[in-house]
Design a protein with these regions (language model features):
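Active-site helical microenvironments for divalent-metal-assisted chemistry
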Residues: 1-194
Length: 194
């Protein structure tokens, strides 16, 4: 029995590490928009870590999808490639949270709001984690070119997206609400001091 439990844990850890290695390779030339131009892979790891720590998510499919959530949207990775390497369940979740980059940005943002309410519970979890991490980054390490107005608009848009994810995970939803309130306060404070 113990060997079976250890084997499952090792397999789960191996799957997560394999996903991190895959994401690190796919995002290797990408950087975040912050002033430090931090490695993009830090973002996807932060999303998965947040889901596990705050949301107490243990479903490996969700955590692997969180790590891979931007690979199809932001790299040359295909949904079929994800399915081949990580299974169709992971590929489906990633597909649900992937924007169609062929569409104009404003249309993509509107579609995120519309699609959130109909997303699977797993996709809603990934979306919650992604938006929490992004709101924290926009608050504390914004892209240098973003104005106060643009930062506040991002927070308001994120709230509209997450409205469709409500009822999925109370701890993550609470954290989202907290980071938005703190973010708005900090951004407005910084604007007043400028």
């Amino acid at each position: 029995m113990l060997n079976r439990c250890l084997g499952a844990a090792i397999s789960s850890s191996a799957d997560l590490l394999r996903a991190i290695a895959f994401a690190a390779d796919k995002h290797r030339d990408q950087r975040r928009k912050d002033a430090e131009a931090s490695p993009y892979v830090n973002h996807v790891i932060a999303v998965a870590e947040l889901l596990a720590r705050v949301g107490e998510i243990t479903d490996q499919t969700v955590l692997v999808a969180a790590i891979l959530h931007d690979t199809v949207e932001d790299t040359e990775t295909t949904a079929q490639e994800l399915a081949d390497h990580f299974g169709t369940a992971v590929a489906r979740i990633v597909a649900e949270v992937t924007d169609d980059k062929a569409l104009p940005k404003e249309e993509r943002k509107l579609l995120q709001v519309e699609h959130a309410r109909d997303a699977s519970p797993a996709a809603k979890l990934v979306k919650l984690g992604d938006k929490i991490v992004n709101v924290v980054d926009v608050t504390n390490q914004p892209p240098p070119t973003w104005s106060v107005e643009r930062r506040l608009e991002y927070l308001a848009w994120a709230e509209r997206v997450i409205a469709g994810c409500r009822g999925t995970n109370a701890a993550l939803e609470r954290m989202f609400d907290e980071v938005v309130v703190r973010g708005r306060e900090k951004i407005l404070q910084e604007a007043g001091a400028a």
